[in-house]
Each structure stands twice: as C-alpha cells, then as structure tokens.
Amino acid sequence: MSASAACGFAAMLKTVKIKNFRSFRQFELHDLGRINLLVGANNSGKTSVLEAIHLLRAQGNPRAFIDLMKSRGEYMSGESKSNREWNIRHLFHGHSFDVGSEFSVTGATQKSKHLEHLTVSVSTHDPIRHTFREDLSRRLEIENEDRLGLFEAYDLKVDWSFGKEHNSWGNLVSLQGGLSSP
C-alpha cells in the first residue's frame, strides 16, 4: 500500500479549489458527497471541473494531460498526426500562456489532514540548464542555433503533492503553447 493510500488519498474529495484553469479564474466546491450532480448551461464549465479533478487525481502524470487534450482535439493546427503538438494554452484561464502563467487544483478529503495539490506553471526557458542542447547542436550541425530560433521556448513545470509524496515533471513548450508528448 502506498503512503498516499494509507493517508487517505483514495478517499473521496470533500473540497476542491480550482484557480486559473480553463474558464475558471477561481472556483470552489465544498461539502462534496458520494454522488454529486453538476448542473449548468452549455459551456459553463461542468466538464472543466471534472477535468481539473482528473488531473489532480492523476498525481501529475503527463499522460493525463495528453489524454485530456486529445479528447477535446486540442492540438496545434497544421500538425501531422504522427508529429502532433498538443495546445496546452487551452488549459490556462483565458488561454493566457506566457511567463508566469499558472493554474492550480487543490483537494481536501475528510480522512486526511494533508491537502492534495497540483500546480502547472510556465517559466522562461534557460537552454543552459538543458544538457541536450550541445548534443542537438552537434547532431544537426548548426553553428548559430539562436539565429534559427530553435530554442525559443518556455518551460512547463507540473508539480503534484500529497503529504510527503511529491511528483513533478517538466517539458519544453513552444511560445505558442505547443506541447510534444512528454
């Protein structure tokens, strides 16, 4: 049994807080029960609430992000199916995707004193931090890679935590929000 299961991770969520995710600047659900009914007009955010909870409960798994965007057909236009980039900007409130953009989902259960928390943030890409730069330059035999703009990108960082458990990953994202499969 994992530490998260022992701490009540598998337990039902009682409260969910969503910040800057899709259509929500800030949204909270309280007093959730075993069965909950989300009611609202078309395009009011019902599916977005379920998606936020899904990403939270996926413990930051990169596949959950890809599956979510795939189910909505959120990919960069003009991309071939075999080389498709997923358009991550749709996950951010107002499609705002720039350095400092961030969304988060937090959940609390009755059985645990710990909060489950997911944060997805965008920062400036620092190519010096990425060791593959030299290898890529040699492989492509490019003398002036900056002139070609190959490294104009953002860093996307995903952090998930629950008590002492932590999971994180990062990936390069194009300036337009294109995410290749992590």
Report residues per predicted region.
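Phosphate-coordinating catalytic segments in nucleotide- and nucleic-acid-processing enzymes
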Residues: 1-10, 60-182
